[in-house]
Amino acid sequence: MSSYVGVLVSDPWLQSQFTQVELRTLKSKFVSNKTQLGRFTVGDLPPVFEKLKAFNGTIDEDEIKSVLDKSYPNADDEVDFEFFLRAFLSVQARGVEKSGGSKGASSFLKTSTTTVHHAINESEKASYVSHVNNYLRDDPFLKSYLPIDPATNAFFDLVKDGVLLCKLINVAVPGTIDERAINTKKTLNPWERNENLTLGLNSAKAIGCTVVNIGTQDIAEGRPYLVLGLISQIIKIQMLADLNFKKTPSLFQLVDDTQDAEELMGLAPEKVLLKWMNFHLKKAGYEKQVTNFSSDLKDGEAYAYLLNALAPEHSTHVALETKDPTERAKKVLEQAEKLDCKRYLSPKDIVDGSANLNLAFVAQIFQHRNGLTVDDSKTSFAEMMTDDVETSREERCFRLWINSLGTATYVNNVFEDLRNGWVLLEVLDKVSPGSVNWKHANKPPIKMPFKKVENCNEVIKIGKELRFSLVNVAGNDIVQGNKKLLLAFLWQLMRYTMLQLLRNLRSHSQGKEITDADILNWANRKVKRGGRTSQADSFRDKNLSSGMFFLELLSAVEPRVVNWSLVTNGETEEDKKLNATYIISVARKLGCSIFLLPEDIIEVNQKMMLILAASIMYWSLQQQSDTESTVSEDATDDGDANSVAGEISNLSIDGASESSPTVQDQELLTKADNDEDEVDGENNKDA
């Protein structure tokens, strides 16, 4: 492994806010000031921050002091490095807000890892508010607060308690949140409000939103650029939901051969939308190619051709004959109204080239009339799609997990986007800082196949250094898109990350390795100490399908979080589904960042059961760290009080390393390797 050791931060969310270069720079500033001052306090921060290049004169010392006073009123509080980083983020947010978000444009189109830099204009705000008014107007709880006036800040006030956020997520991806878990009283206390916001943010991650720079406090304070940046992502996911082949098989009409079909399946939804638009424009005689949702649509001509092609019954040449762009845009929107497309944008937005609103408008046209038919001659393309439900479900889980880490590259399809090795290197650098030697990495776009192999060989090399089970696996397997091997690698990577998080809670583990058995033992002991009777023999225990064990575990770590009047006995399939859905929402409400589906619990997916239990364990132990508890919650049966450190260290059964491959890992990789050998017995792999 590279001798370089990155700057480590115990809080993974905080770690994700900075690059290693930024962390090293800030660490150096922190250490030098602490050395110079001896005792580094909140009161010492303003002059230190003012001199940082990151702020470059955008915010002065008095303003910095004002920002810090709101969050940290006691100027005598001593500052540690993580405190220093959090304070830096608070000041940075104020600086960006002051400059009008000049560091970057709105990222409704591009998924940026730096949501703090969103700058939403008033037109976009009005469109998002209109969207909320339209889709949530009949909601039993929210209807008394709607419609919202976009000319006021009422929207930012309404979003503060988290209810609207949760409801909008369920509109975008129905069933994501069990609404029984949402606190919906007229007046919520701070705890209940924070639960809703935590549920909302963790659920946003679970549908594909990038929220690495957004915390519950940001939403509770109603910070406009952060709130609208998140809302825009949720709306984008809703608007593009049908841009895939499972929901719209007729999209195969856009391709001519197998290679085109494979490429289209790997495209981001917005790219598919552009391809769809160009497909119809070409048929309509439009000679240009639309490559973006901004400048290429400014003159309104492409819209006029598109609507004439999709709705010949409303066809008119008036828009095309109109010379003034604004007048043409008006005619386009009038024609769209006849298709029942509610206006996401104004004529001015078209002329100005508002990428976000144009994307939403084109997506809405697609939803109302896509102009495609099922072509029997292309049914073979549909057969290319995986029928393996488990594989599809795992791909979804790993894709969402990777995107939640805040990597620079957004993943739309695991099996396509990871084949050049670059994203895997980004993920490895996130979960094991300093493990990647970037001098040996090839950055996309990569045209030469051997460069992709080099990246993937580096991925395998690092995986072996992290003690993953990678027997007979070579970088070329990833490049070739071996699904089973890739999923097996990603599972080990996710498991390694979770176990490292637990291990890094040194006040509990004393730096000792954590095993799968430790997690199971901890969960069983926790449930027993909570006065409940459920126990799990393993993470394959079929009794887990009822959901009772995890509900009792959640109740044991936080008694108030489970409403037992909503829990079923879990005997029928319907009852199991109700419990499983509730478990996921309650865990997210508690603070667990998880990506499983109810089916994973009902079918007892061993891997997801381990991650769920580990996530609950991590949350529980974090709370003990925060309160600096010195007495173990899991005292031994004879009543002796153990140290908190003993809660984990005394659980060890076999002393195995957390990164040693499990039997399941070996089975997965052996099976995947054998399957590959059947396909290509002559493929030589590196040991």
UniProtKB/Swiss-Prot annotation:
SUPFAM superfamilies xrefs: Calponin-homology domain, CH-domain
Location of the Calponin-homology (CH) domain: 122-239, 267-370, 392-498, 513-621
Summary of the knockout phenotype: Delayed pollen germination and inhibition of pollen tube growth due to the disorganization and redistribution of actin filaments.
Tissues showing expression: Expressed in mature pollen.
Keywords: Actin-binding, Cytoplasm, Cytoskeleton, Repeat
Region span, Actin-binding 1: 122-370
GO CC annotation terms, alphabetical: cytoplasm; cytoskeleton
Region (Disordered): 628-687
Start and end residues of each stretch annotated as Actin-binding 2: 392-621
GO molecular function: actin filament binding
Biased composition (Polar residues): 649-667
Role: Cross-links actin filaments (F-actin) in a calcium independent manner. Induces the formation of actin bundles. Stabilizes and prevents F-actin depolymerization mediated by latrunculin B (LatB).
Assembly and oligomerization: Interacts with F-actin.
Protein name according to UniProt: Fimbrin-5
Organism of provenance: Arabidopsis thaliana (Mouse-ear cress)
